[in-house]
Amino acid sequence: MAEERNFRKVRRGYVVSDKMDKTISVELEQRSTHPLYGKVVRSTRTVKVHDEHNEAHIGDLVSIMETRPLSKTKRWRLDSIIERAK
């Protein structure tokens, strides 16, 4: 009955918005090398994250974990706050 859960993605990013109730927006950065020119290309995307106790604030570095769909756009939940904004 108590089976092990499948591997869940864990990402780190910065909180860019905390104006919603129990939801934060986190900006995730992905760096990759251009296949021809070798330059490091930086691309970002913003995801909505479930924050049950409204703990995170703008500028915090957070760890988020993939979860089941919680709403139309929320598929991530707050795992931990790594570093508070100064």
Swiss-Prot record:
PROSITE patterns, per the entry: RIBOSOMAL_S17 (PS00056)
GO cellular component terms listed in the entry, alphabetical order: cytosolic small ribosomal subunit
SUPFAM superfamilies reported for this sequence: Nucleic acid-binding proteins
Pfam families the UniProt entry points to: Ribosomal_S17 (PF00366)
GO MF entries: rRNA binding; structural constituent of ribosome
Key words of the record: Ribonucleoprotein, Ribosomal protein, RNA-binding, rRNA-binding
GO biological process terms on file: translation
InterPro entries reported for this sequence: NA-bd_OB-fold, Ribosomal_uS17, Ribosomal_uS17_bact/chlr, Ribosomal_uS17_CS
Keyword rRNA-binding: yes
Entry keyword Ribosomal protein: yes
Function: One of the primary rRNA binding proteins, it binds specifically to the 5'-end of 16S ribosomal RNA.
Family indicated by similarity: Belongs to the universal ribosomal protein uS17 family.
Subunit description: Part of the 30S ribosomal subunit.
The protein's name: Small ribosomal subunit protein uS17
Chain's gene name: rpsQ
